[in-house]
Curated annotation (Swiss-Prot):
Organism: Saccharomyces cerevisiae (strain ATCC 204508 / S288c)
Membrane topology label: Peripheral membrane protein
Segments for region (Disordered): 360-385
Gene, per the UniProt record: SPR28
Family: Belongs to the TRAFAC class TrmE-Era-EngA-EngB-Septin-like GTPase superfamily. Septin GTPase family.
Name of this chain's protein: Sporulation-regulated protein 28
Residue stretches in coiled coil: 384-417
One Pfam family from the record: Septin
GO process annotations (BP): actomyosin contractile ring assembly; ascospore formation; cellular bud neck septin ring organization; cytoskeleton-dependent cytokinesis; division septum assembly; protein localization to bud neck
Compositionally biased region (Polar residues): 360-381
Any one GO molecular function term: structural molecule activity
Length: 423
């Protein structure tokens, strides 16, 4: 008798590196950082509650996208916080300013894999009379997250526990208007599209007829193409592949069905979604969010009435790792190459000014500035001992980087050279 083969060991040996990494990631849990942009009233907070299946408490004195109440915001007129002002005509003349709100949410998806969602919002984005500085602040925030990672990489003693604050995807909520996409939204998307994976969203799609919705999607696609806005590339991925992870299929035989399993994801973008604060559990004990009208009701998770379920499957399932890989291997590497190239004529990695959660100053007063150490290093002849030590440490780091670069260049030459030793 021949000994029985250990098929589990054989399977482990033949698994691809990506598959092994995926299985290991499932055991440790997954993490995704989501940036949500769009003007007030576009339904961002309700979308997050539907996506996470829970109330993530964005309205506890900081932010409520679906509420008219203004709390703890900053006005350009006086730079002071406004506390609990009643909605209506009393606040109609006030600009809300711009601030940063972050939340961390822990959830288990349908596959039973623990997922950590880091949520980033900029309340006031697009809501001010003068929005000219909003794009600068948001761009600087994204650049600063890249800079933080780069600073950690060039440290001699690296802090492996340093939090990575880079957003992996930006969901941009574009409210439908008769004139198409607003100029501010176009300019902001152009500004940030090379710093974060951009996915355009059409919220509150139930307010449009099917003809109006298709027209608005065409307008958004046209504006994105004409303005060379880079959006996340789904390549030839299909909706059927996306839903397969959720053990779901597209019922193309249904009269209501708009798509089939072979429909490419990029063909339905921008995603038209409907969300609701009302929910219940269906016969399979799954949470369903219900939107009620005079003529009936609509299930948010129904694939025939909204693109929400496809977007959820993309973010929490099929494309979660790809969004992170593109962020790290493409967007960050482009930033890193640019900064290190410029660094030959500079002493330090730049700092970028943006409004953090503790800053309540007016956006119009924000300007890019370097920190005190950078200003000191700008004068090589300074007698300041601290500046000398910092200067010396940076020179040491530069030498290490140059040594690594020489080794890389040497390896590339060796790989490119013909194998002359072969007979």
């Amino acid at each position: 008798m021949f000994p029985m083969k250990d098929h589990s060991a054989l399977e482990q040996h033949t698994l691809s590196r990506d598959e092994l990494r995926r299985r290991k990631g499932y055991k440790k849990g997954l993490q995704l950082s989501i940036l949500l942009l769009g003007e007030k009233g576009s339904g961002k907070s309700t979308f997050l509650n539907n996506l996470c299946g829970q109330d993530i408490s964005l309205s506890d004195g900081d932010y409520d996208d679906d509420d008219d109440k203004v709390t703890n915001n900053v006005t350009p007129e006086n730079g002071n916080a406004i506390e609990d002002i009643d909605p209506g005509y009393k606040t109609a003349h006030l600009s809300p300013g711009l601030k940063l709100v972050t939340r961390r949410v822990y959830l288990n998806d349908e596959l039973g894999v623990p997922i950590t969602l880091d949520i980033i919002l900029f309340p006031g984005c697009g809501d001010n009379v003068d929005n000219s500085q909003s794009s600068v602040v948001i761009k600087n925030y994204l650049d600063q997250q890249f800079a933080n990672v780069l600073k950690e990489e060039v440290r001699i003693k690296r802090n492996t526990k340093e939090t990575d604050g880079r957003p992996h995807v930006c969901l941009y909520f574009l409210k439908s208007t008769p004139r198409g996409v607003k100029k501010f939204d176009i300019e902001l998307m152009k500004t940030i599209c090379d710093k974060v994976n951009l996915i355009p969203i059409i919220p509150k799609a139930d307010g449009l007829t099917e003809t109006e919705l298709n027209l608005h999607k065409d307008i958004v696609r046209q504006e994105i193409s004409q303005n060379n806005i880079r959006v996340f590339d789904f390549k030839s991925d299909t909706l059927g592949e996306t839903l397969a992870l959720y053990d779901m299929d597209i019922d193309s035989s249904s009269a209501k069905s708009k798509y089939d399993n072979d429909t490419k994801i990029k063909e339905i973008s921008p995603f038209a979604i409907v969300c609701s604060k009302t929910f219940n559990k269906n016969s399979e004990n799954r949470v369903e969010h219900i939107r009620t009208y005079e003529w009936g009701s609509l299930v948010v998770e129904d694939q025939n009435t909204s693109d929400f379920i496809y977007l959820k499957a993309i973010l929490l399932g099929s494309h979660l790792q790809e969004l992170k890989d593109v962020t790290n291997n493409v967007l960050y590497e482009n930033y890193r190459a640019k900064v290190l190239t410029e660094k030959k004529n500079n002493y330090d990695i730049p700092n970028y000014s943006y409004i953090d959660e503790t800053s309540r100053g007016s956006v119009s007063n924000v300007s890019t500035r370097r920190n005190s150490a950078s200003r000191t290093l700008g004068n090589p002849d300074t007698n300041d001992e601290n500046a000398y030590q910092i200067h010396k440490e940076i020179d040491e780091k530069n030498r290490i980087i140059e040594d690594y670069q020489r080794k890389i260049d040497l390896l590339e030459k060796m790989l490119a050279a013909p194998h002359q030793n072969k007979v």
